[in-house]
Amino acid sequence: MKKKILSLMLMVSLAASLAACGQDSGKNSNSTDLSKTETEASSGQTGEAETTLVYGSADYTRINPAMDEHGEINLLLFNGLTAHDADDNIVPGLAEKWEYDAETCTYTFHIRDGIQWHDGEKFTADDVKFTIEAIMDPENGSENAPNYEDVEEITVIDDSTVSFRLSEPNVAFLEYMTMAILPKHLLEGENMQESDFFRAPVGTGPYKLESWDEGQSIVLVKNEDYYLGAPKIDKVIFKIVPDDNAQAMQLESGELDLALLDPKNAQNFKEKDGFTCYDMTTADYRGILFNFANDYWTKNRDIIPAVCYSIDRQAIIDSVLLGEGMAAYSPLQRNIYNNENVEHYDYNPEKAQEILEAAGCTRNSDGFYERDGEEIGFVISVMSGEQDRIDIAQAAAQQLRETGINW
């Protein structure tokens, strides 16, 4: 029988605890401190040294925080009106304070004095209005647009004050205002997806772009005029190493000072002299994303629970992540927006088979379920270079086969 094929990102949903590793100073003469490598300062003056951190990074085609949802480098180059503290609480960012009028559902933000863009231009409320309206414009196709659907009006009161009137209360709005603000004076009239600005970004953050060697490295230098004070590390190099295994090798060889590793690679460094590992419980997750743009899942929506019941999250955490993770049931796991009462679809292959059979599926001679003469199955697409995603997808695929769903 002909198998139905579609592209589906299949990764078990879990909040992984990953490890960042770097070499310790003082362990031996060749070791490098986690946070800095000392080199001669560019000024050449005796006794001066600059500190450089080399970080193993995925590749970038652009740096565009307003249009793209993710990007580690964004936090070093840009700021939002609000920010997170070490405990993930919302704290002031570019805005020193704000008020909320419950009667009109209006937030009013007051911007700090003296904020400058990396090119020396003054940061104003006009930049805030420009950025959020650009995100909201459907023609720009921003991944972040859904966060601002409640915004009815943005008003610039003066250079240092901007207000947002919402259609209804939104408990997450201050979280959304951690969004990086972009410079109106450099982007007004530009294509928000294709502007050259996103290859030479100018922000307000603690670091500014020095150089970008495509496919090799992105070099940032500290912003001496940063509103919270200049960073202690003079230079941060995002060395492009897209493969997790290659990052681990370069960390061990000393080519990298810092890398965010999957648990299997991190395990090799935990007892190794000269390295420090930090276990971080994060909100990062891997999830099954059904491609509803393909009518296969529109027509077979009723068997989606069978896929969910076929996945043993804890077994994957134990085998792929060496126990360094927690079973997750939605993208919101570790904050106040998490709803513990949602259906968890815990591992239950018998229930998965009941759902398939109730939907009219029958087993073929190979032991896999068919429906209307077509085998239930799909192509599993997974991001290359990230070994934990690959391993998770392979483990999930095997569990699906054990239920009777082919791939």
State where each predicted segment sits.
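Surface-exposed binding/hinge segments that line
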Residues: 99, 103, 145-187
